Amino acid sequence: MLFFSYFKDLVGQEVTVELKNDLAIRGTLHSVDQYLNIKLENTRVVDQDKYPHMLSVRNCFIRGSVVRYVQLPKDGVDVDLLHDAARREARGG
């Protein structure tokens, strides 16, 4: 649940989601659920030449199991807080 809580705090910020098929989509994080399914708004494809058929997509739902990486905004990451939460989760409490 660590990452679910973390991503919930990022709602409203711009993120880039890279999928396992190498498609990278940048957009505003609208919502995330416990399965780490992601809903983005105001989306745009990072490599528009490679994926021209995706140019008209403005909102999308991404299944969590197809996500390879999520790139976060630099100011959206509190590293100390994330380390503390990871330690607490690893200890089971």
Swiss-Prot record:
Which SUPFAM superfamilies does the record associate with it? Sm-like ribonucleoproteins
Main localisation, per the record?
Answer: cytoplasm
- Please report which protein family the annotation says this sequence is part of: Belongs to the snRNP Sm proteins family.
Give tissue specificity per the record.
Expressed in roots, leaves, stems, flowers and siliques.
Question: Where does this protein reside within or beyond the cell?
Answer: Cytoplasm; Nucleus
Any one GO BP annotation for this protein: mRNA splicing, via spliceosome
Query: What exactly does this protein do?
Result: Component of LSM protein complexes, which are involved in RNA processing. Component of the cytoplasmic LSM1-LSM7 complex which is involved in mRNA degradation by promoting decapping and leading to accurate 5'-3' mRNA decay. The cytoplasmic LSM1-LSM7 complex regulates developmental gene expression by the decapping of specific development-related transcripts. Component of the nuclear LSM2-LSM8 complex which is involved splicing nuclear mRNAs.
Asked if Magnesium is a keyword of the record, the answer is no
Q: Name one Pfam family in it.
A: LSM
Molecular function GO terms recorded: RNA binding
Quaternary structure per UniProt? Answer: Component of the heptameric LSM1-LSM7 complex that forms a seven-membered ring structure with a donut shape. The LSM subunits are arranged in the order LSM1, LSM2, LSM3, LSM6, LSM5, LSM7 and LSM4. LSM2 subunit interacts only with its two neighboring subunits, LSM1A or LSM1B and LSM3A or LSM3B. Component of the heptameric LSM2-LSM8 complex that forms a seven-membered ring structure with a donut shape. The LSM subunits are arranged in the order LSM8, LSM2, LSM3, LSM6, LSM5, LSM7 and LSM4. LSM2 subunit interacts only with its two neighboring subunits, LSM8 and LSM3A or LSM3B.
A single GO CC term, please?
Lsm2-8 complex
Tell me which residues make up the Sm domain: 2-76
Name the gene.
Answer: LSM2
Keyword RNA-binding in annotation:
yes
Q: Which CDD domains match?
A: LSm2 (cd01725)
Listed name of the protein: Sm-like protein LSM2
Please summarize what the entry says happens upon disruption of the gene: Embryonic lethality when homozygous.
User: Matching PROSITE patterns, A to Z?
Assistant: SM (PS52002)
Keyword annotations from UniProtKB, A to Z:
Cytoplasm, mRNA processing, mRNA splicing, Nucleus, Ribonucleoprotein, RNA-binding, Spliceosome
